[in-house]
Amino acid sequence: WGPGLNQLVSLHNPQLVRNWWDYKYSKASIRDWRTSGLYIHDVIDINNKWKAMGSARMDFYNYRTATAKVKDGRQEYDEADRSEWKKVKTSAFTGRAGLVYIPVEEISLYASFGSHFKPYNTMYSSRVIYLDRNGKRFNPSKDGGEVFKPEKGYQAEIGVRYMWANRIDFSGSVYYIRKNNVVKNLGTQEEKDETTGEMVQKTIQAQVGTADSRGFDLELTVHPVSTLAVTGGLGWQDYRIRKINQSKDYPEYTDPSKNVRATGIPRTTFYVYADYTIPKGLLKNLSFHLSGTFQDKIFTDVANRVYNPALFLVDGGLFYTIKQKVTLALNVDNLFDKEYFKSTTVYGKPRNFTGTISYRF
């Protein structure tokens, strides 16, 4: 919408709404992420019916941020005008284990368990009151460094797969995901600002939450003939904040999202797509693709029933392969040019076309 619609944007100094909104930037926010890790993975064939898998991983996470004055209000800055870096460094060990049982050739049953971690990039602010995982107030370093411990958790999953004569491929799984050390905003409180000495409203951020997600996934692929594949899938999940530790220092503050369906996540998703390749004749190796995806309504406010409506989009494509080396493709997204919102204030893409040429060596 607006004068920026269908405009070409410069990669060097992008201005989507130029000549309409001439805003001058005063400073740049510089961020740098670096992640490295070591891992080991192995699959063991116990016998012709049992297989086991195990893996271990050590991750090292580094994040830093700084600010700098910009040149002439544009998106350029001098390194000499940059502030000192504020840094977050953390590491974590995670693992995963799985077991597969094959009672007959067409069926396999599996179970898996794995752990995860997710670092927080939170930096100290004098306008925030910080509470640890026990609900106790603490004072982070003002010079940077880790404020909140990383989110940690685990995932457990069981599933089944059935394959028959290259005609049917079915898989289904049920999962449970647990998250600990979830950071929540518990409200505000008026206190004296350490920098200015004035009374200000401070946000209370607390690492007191525990959340979980449970759901299932189903997928079925059918090959009526060798040149046609039809696939359909269904997913359902329920994500909620399950527990919020009560703070002894601030007992009057609670989070209304406890045990309430989470916002920003669709509960049900569904997709179906088909691919057909002409096997012989003048148009041999010409392929057609058609797909449809459904997304359940996404709540932005569960209590007040505010949400983005459910959405169904259709995409299509043509592919032509020459001597198994060169592939020409034309994809059409949002085939029927449906108007929709990607999020509350972001308009979804209209019908759009993408052409590609690829070569396989």
Model-found features: residue ranges?
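Residues on the lipid-exposed face of transmembrane beta-strands in outer-membrane beta-barrel proteins
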Residues: 38-44, 97-101, 158-162, 218-222, ...
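Gram-negative outer-membrane beta-barrel transporters
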Residues: 48, 171, 176-178, 190, ...
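Gram-negative outer-membrane beta-barrel proteins
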Residues: 60-68, 117-123, 130, 166, ...
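Residues that define the transmembrane beta-barrel architecture of outer-membrane proteins
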Residues: 32-36, 89-93, 152-156, 212-216, ...
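Structural signature of Gram-negative outer-membrane beta-barrels, strongest in the C-terminal barrel
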Residues: 29-179, 213, 223, 275
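Solvent-exposed loop segments that connect transmembrane elements
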Residues: 1-24, 63-91, 121-146, 184-206, ...
